[in-house]
Amino acid sequence: MARYRCRRSQSRSRCCRQRRRCRRRRRQRFRARKRAMRCCHRRYRLRCRRY
């Protein structure tokens, strides 16, 4: 299972790439949807949650 954590020290583009991966996973796994939303939502761009 993929784990993404975007830190403020990371570049924004790197964080966005991680979010894109996370979005793909969200489509694949309906059950993980809430957690994926937390990770991928624009509001959490600089601090993605691990799951």
UniProtKB/Swiss-Prot annotation:
Q: Which InterPro entries match?
A: Protamine_P1 (IPR000221)
Report the GO terms under cellular component.
Answer: nucleosome; nucleus
The alphabetized list of GO BP terms reads: chromosome condensation; sperm DNA condensation
Tissue specificity statement from the Swiss-Prot or TrEMBL entry:
Testis.
Q: List UniProt keywords, sorted A-Z.
A: Chromosome, Developmental protein, Differentiation, DNA condensation, DNA-binding, Nucleosome core, Nucleus, Spermatogenesis
Cell cycle as a keyword? no
Q: Where in the cell is it found?
A: Nucleus; Chromosome
What superkingdom heads the lineage?
Answer: Eukaryota
As one GO molecular function, the record gives: DNA binding
Subcellular location, principal = nucleus
Entry's family note: Belongs to the protamine P1 family.
Role this protein plays: Protamines substitute for histones in the chromatin of sperm during the haploid phase of spermatogenesis. They compact sperm DNA into a highly condensed, stable and inactive complex.
Name-wise, this protein is Sperm protamine P1
Origin organism is: Colobus guereza
Question: Gene encoding this polypeptide?
Answer: PRM1
